């Protein structure tokens, strides 16, 4: 998995970057090596809310998640949970498609 973390409207400290990278590292087991993950962390100008957005460019599919809370770390945590659910669904869908093709050719 190739991971890119960037920020918009806030200073991205090395501590915050490493926190995001370690949390998103949980996805590495579920994704292929060639999968690219882009994450943008932002502070909204009004309301003091923090947003974490991610795009996962998997084979044949782009998964996208956005989470916004008053705490940036909580936004990152919720973002990773959201992505994990999407990746499980994506992998299950691909597994069923392969099974369907195999059954079709085997008949």
Each PLM stretch: what is its role?
Residues 1-107:
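N-terminal, polar/charged subdomain of small-to-medium soluble alpha/beta proteins
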